[in-house]
């Protein structure tokens, strides 16, 4: 009821303004920013501003109004900072002052022309000479700009969250800095940035369920990409030796604190290296990013001190299972009957055509992942679950593959690429023959096999989940907090 009443009065003010003024003007220009004002003049004393007339023109959203008779203090803010505005009858006419103060509400966007000064409490402020109402806010803002209390509203109305929540603003500014520094690092290391299709004729590069769309003119179904992997490797066949892509992937699967159907990844591929070299690149990349943002290699996340100093810990998937599963041995997890019983004891639903490798992965996900707090490369992934990775020379059941875990989250997946077209073809066909209920979207990619037949040089490639990395570097615990517009259930259901 209170909100309805306030909306009524705000609309009434707007209608009065329509009669006499050019409302929603677009001819106001800033000559600086609030951030630059603070940076350049914060340390100057009151006398400096008495002797130097600093004329500024700035704009922002009103977040507080204090009316004190013949003068008033406003506070305006933009995405970066805030500043106090002083307006009085002495600086503009009495009639204009009364009219302006009567018009204004918290949430309005105003332009201010004035001079800088410092108050008796040494607060850097703007003495207003002219004030322009640029946008009238008809709806009142929640909770006096102290932040939204309802997390669901934060996700559905991100604009309100950004206006009222400093942590959210900082999170998304930091996200931009992280991505910019990833790009700087890759370019510094002589990688070429490329773009590959977002719509695929068949889903490839992963086992996830795809989103399906339809091209009307061609009358064909297309799939939003699960991963760009197969296209990127075709570019290595074409002669590129160091490439990367930062873009969206789509997986038609469940929502969780670390899963969103639409997410951002950086994938990169390098010719003439193997997965050991690849791990060094990943270490250097993360070390570079953390140092650029925090000027140190250690950060706090969820009360853990995370150390990004090189080298990161390495452990095989098999050793990690034995370490975190009591009384489980290497021989146990190599025997199909015993490992099946172990999986069932952990309440894992086992499908009949799962082999030892798939069961190891399921047990690892259930019992080990959450314990990997410090940056850890888990290596020696089973061939059964790694159809695109090169098998080890001395053991064809495991591959030259790693996944990087930080704070219990997988943030990277890389391996030495399988470049034998015959072996790759056999792997694809074996996948098709043994696909489980959760793997019904596996297809045989003939074009990729054809490209391998022209010759893929020895190559290693890696994908890094940007959203999960941002979660860790901004101390957020849900992927929804680091994606501006996360996927949500229908609010009406």
Curated annotation (Swiss-Prot):
Any GO MF annotation of the entry: magnesium ion binding
EC number in record: 6.1.1.6
Binding site for Mg(2+) 1: 403, 410
Any one of the GO BP annotations: lysyl-tRNA aminoacylation
Compartments, as annotated in UniProt: Cytoplasm
Annotated residues for binding of Mg(2+) 2: 410
Top enzyme class: ligase
Description of how the protein assembles with itself and partners: Homodimer.
Stored NCBIfam families: lysS_bact, PRK00484.1
Similarity annotation: Belongs to the class-II aminoacyl-tRNA synthetase family.
Protein name: Lysine--tRNA ligase
Organism: Wigglesworthia glossinidia brevipalpis
Gene that encodes it: lysS
